[in-house]
Structures are given as C-alpha cells and as structure tokens.
Amino acid sequence: MNRIGVFGATGRVGKLLVELLGSDENAKLSSVFVRKELDFSMPPGALVTNDYKTFLEGCDVVIDFSLPDATAALLETAMQGHPKPLVIGTTGLDAHHFNLIHEASRQMPVLYATNMSLGVAILNKMVHTAAKALADFDIEIVEMHHRHKKDSPSGTALTLAESCAKARGVELDEVRVSGRNGNIGERKSEEIAVMSLRGGDIAGKHTVGFYSEGEYLEFVHTATSRMTFAKGALRAAKWLAKQESGLYGISDALGI
C-alpha cells in the first residue's frame, strides 16, 4: 500500500487527488500539506500539517500541485535529510526551480511533468515526429484555460513547443513568439508561436498546428475534467515509488 502525501491539497487538482485516494485500493492518503484552513473533509487517519518536515515524514511518496515558491521549499526540505519520491505537477517554474529539481533528483526519484494526462504524453510524441517530418511547415500553438489560471503560456504549451524545437534542432528561446501586434512584417519561417487564451472554466485545450501552402495539420487535446490530471499523477506516484534516484518524465511512468 502506497502512502501518498498531497502537497497543495486545497488547489483544484489537489482536492481531486484527495477524493481519488479515498477510494483507491492500492494507495492511501497519509499526509496533507496546507497553508490555509480546509473547507472539505479528509479521510480518517490523514495527517494535516503546514510543516514541511512533518509532512514528508508522514508519507512514502509526494504528489505536488502547488505554487513555484512552495515547490522550491519542498525540494529544499527534502534535500535536507528527508528524501522522498516526488511527483511534481506545479507549473510556472523558472530556472531556479529547475536547478532545484535537478539537484534533488541526485538524492531521490523525481518526476516532473507540466501535464499528467496520457493524451498529452501521446500528443507530445506526435508533435515531435510531425515537427521533424514537416520541416518547412509553420508551427503555431494555441492553449486555452480557465480564467483563474495564473501562468501564461501554460506549462504544457511550452513543453509542446520545446518538443517541436528539439525536433528541428533549434533553441526555443531563439524562435519562440508569444504575441503579435502592429506592423511586424511577415512571419519568419523558423518561428514557433505560442499563444494563450483565458476564459470560463476550461480545464485545458491545446492545439498544435503545422501549416503550409495547400494543406495544414492540427493536433488537438482537450481535457474535459481535471480528474484526468489527478489520475495520471497518482499513476505516476505508484510507479515512481519503485524507482531509483533520477529525473523522470510522465512518458517514463506511462511506458511510452
């Protein structure tokens, strides 16, 4: 039985993880990290705390859907004598956070993914193949999320853009375009555009388009419920609990 710690249990995905663990036969919720008062009930026996060390000591595997600074503090505490397998789904991370993730992965297994769904994992492989095969096609990526999402573009959109850039042997920072306005001239052939839309309660929609003269190809993934992210994260946690120290992605956990 995997004892799961949910870090960021009051968030949208965190709440779903708590719900999911209440009925799972092979894992149980053992510890929960929160910074504010809970407005929902926890399963009997679950430890609720705002202390990083206590939280880590109360579980075997951690699933983190929180905020960048909280993720950084979690990683730092884990590296100070409290290593645990860490599944990190927090988005909006910067270079400092990624350095911490790489450093932590030397001491414990760490799985980082901007999206935990099986569909997006497949999509990522498909767009990599398409970007390489359709070398002279223009790439445009559009992501849409609910009005409350704080980071833009989405982590998933950036992951997809990075996959396309790697397929073409270029650095994303050198070719990425995140908006167009005014008399900017013609589109440069090497551009990889990443555009963001916000509105309503959309869980997540990503469109990756490859456009040429006479034809175009579009890949679309739509998440109709955030529960798909929770299920993917729990599946990843069960897999990660058996792994050695190192840095992993969701494709590793899914075996694709």
Curated annotation (Swiss-Prot):
Q: What Gene3D superfamilies does the database record attribute to this sequence? A: Dihydrodipicolinate Reductase, domain 2, NAD(P)-binding Rossmann-like Domain
Q: Which residues bind NADP(+)?
A: K36
Q: Indicate yes or no for the key word NAD.
A: yes
| Catalytically driven reaction(s) | (S)-2,3,4,5-tetrahydrodipicolinate + NAD(+) + H2O = (2S,4S)-4-hydroxy-2,3,4,5-tetrahydrodipicolinate + NADH + H(+); (S)-2,3,4,5-tetrahydrodipicolinate + NADP(+) + H2O = (2S,4S)-4-hydroxy-2,3,4,5-tetrahydrodipicolinate + NADPH + H(+)
For the keyword NADP, the answer is yes
Could you tell me the keywords of this UniProt record? Amino-acid biosynthesis, Cytoplasm, Diaminopimelate biosynthesis, Lysine biosynthesis, NAD, NADP, Oxidoreductase
Pathway note: Amino-acid biosynthesis; L-lysine biosynthesis via DAP pathway; (S)-tetrahydrodipicolinate from L-aspartate: step 4/4
Q: What is its EC number?
A: 1.17.1.8
The record's subcellular locations are: Cytoplasm
Q: Name one GO molecular function term.
A: NADP binding
Predominant location: cytoplasm
Catalytic-site annotation from UniProt: H145, K149
Task: List the GO terms this entry assigns under cellular component, sorted alphabetically.
Answer: cytosol
Q: Which PROSITE patterns match?
A: DAPB
Q: Which CDD domains does the record cross-reference, listed alphabetically?
A: DHDPR_N
* One GO term of the biological process aspect: diaminopimelate biosynthetic process
Q: Which residues bind NAD(+)?
A: G8, A9, T10, G11, R12, V13, G89, T90, T91, A113, T114, N115, M116
Q: Tell me the residue numbers annotated for binding (S)-2,3,4,5-tetrahydrodipicolinate.
A: H146, G155, T156
Family that this chain belongs to: Belongs to the DapB family.
Question: Which PANTHER family does the UniProt entry name for this protein?
Answer: 4-HYDROXY-TETRAHYDRODIPICOLINATE REDUCTASE 1, CHLOROPLASTIC-RELATED (PTHR20836:SF0), DIHYDRODIPICOLINATE REDUCTASE (PTHR20836)
What is known about what this protein does? Catalyzes the conversion of 4-hydroxy-tetrahydrodipicolinate (HTPA) to tetrahydrodipicolinate.
Kindly provide the name given to this protein in its UniProt entry.
Answer: 4-hydroxy-tetrahydrodipicolinate reductase
Give the species. Wolinella succinogenes (strain ATCC 29543 / DSM 1740 / CCUG 13145 / JCM 31913 / LMG 7466 / NCTC 11488 / FDC 602W)
Record lineage? Bacteria, Pseudomonadati, Campylobacterota, Epsilonproteobacteria, Campylobacterales
